Amino acid sequence: MTRFVIIGGGPAGNTAATTAARLGAQVTMIEREVIGGAAHLWDCIPSKSMIATGRAISRTRAIGGMGLETVDTSVDVETLTQRIEWVKDTMRDNTTSLLQSQGVRLIRGSGRFTDPNTVVV
């Protein structure tokens, strides 16, 4: 029998699930989209990756004032996109593996309460 049902596999849900499981609870997580959190994986990681790339270009251009020869730097959008996808996939896979290693049962779908003690998917 599941003692804890967590609806949503974002950062808060993942923390709650692993904490409860480590304390010995039987935990079920219901996620309709992606483990790791849609906003986290679709907004934060891509934007932070693009910001980091922009900063690297800025630093590369600034080294000319340090007596170093510079080359014109540009963004390879395909490579940047591949890196973003790799980071997202790695984070999602690592989070899923962590949940499974803690014995958290994962269910794909949308969960909702039908009464204070019942969740349907």
Model regions: which residues?
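Short alpha-helical segment within the catalytic ATP-binding CA
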Residues: 15
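Beta1/beta-strand and adjacent pyrophosphate-binding region of the FAD-binding site
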Residues: 1-12
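Glycine-rich flavin
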Residues: 2, 18-25, 30-121
